[in-house]
């Protein structure tokens, strides 16, 4: 695991747990905006890129993140953001409560399956094969993720997809298998730790059906969590393709408490 730090001069801290299957540079613009206000710690998971190590599990990742934060003297976080696999990691991080978080955004976070083992294994096999097909075929990659939608304005889609295709080929078979098994089968305590964190769960309007079980899980596990639908967005689209809108929305949530305090005056 690697940790990229930005805005280190700020006192306020924000943990940034990205989704899988995207290189660290896919989040540069959004992280850059957040670093105007926060000391941002962006996690790069094992097995993502040429790290020389395989991704093991959500549990291992959360332990490593916790150890890194504690080793660097961070005993409390002002904010945390996790998307997809990162949302799974953030869900467990919050549930354990070893490092309190004031406000957290779980963006389309994956939650544990609640179905028989055989069905979970079949789902993992489906996801594993789907990833391998996308990583192997440029045509499939561009069909599933059309460049005209998934390339930011002003950037060269050919160069970006060349880089993305090369990046996806760095994932080992073990990493891919572990990602899809662990993201959907990680363990949680029966009840989450009580630490007063304000949690919101984001999901794109165009992925609502796909996130249905995740939304139900979050509502049950974190009863006080707010739900926030992002209009006209698909999975992880806001944070990667619309950094200014992402920044506006996340800062509106992260600064709610301060705004209310200022109004009370």
Predicted regions, residues:
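Gly/Ala-rich beta-loop-alpha elbow adjacent to hydrolase catalytic centers
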Residues: 82-90
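Catalytic histidine-centered segment of alpha/beta-hydrolase-like enzymes
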Residues: 233-245
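Acidic catalytic loop of the alpha/beta-hydrolase fold
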Residues: 205-210
